[in-house]
Amino acid sequence: KELLKHVLHQIAVRQLYLQPGITAKTLQEELHVPASLFGTHFKEQTGHSFSEHINKLRMDYAAKLLTEYPQYTIDAIAKMCGIDSRQHFHRLFSEYFGITPSAFRKNHLSSDNKDIKQ
């Protein structure tokens, strides 16, 4: 349990989730932890599979970039989040937030403008 906490901390602090193509195997090798940590044990402790956890972190980061850096293109943000395919990024984002990245940005920016006008 403590080892998994350490791994989750390393993933977050070092932003390892932003590495394109990151897998449980590459992370296991990089952090020198047993491969078994990323299977059933990971899901039991976090409620998500390893890939679901990585995607959640990526989508949270994408949402932050979309709202804080409106000058960045959607493709640039996808790449910054470790996702090379525009289609894959759109699918993941839409599954996670129920809205496209462009609509998310537009909604957030228009709500920010309403706050400023009041």
Feature annotation, model-predicted:
Residues I22-P34, F38, F42, A76-D84, ...:
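Append "Primarily bacterial transcriptional regulators
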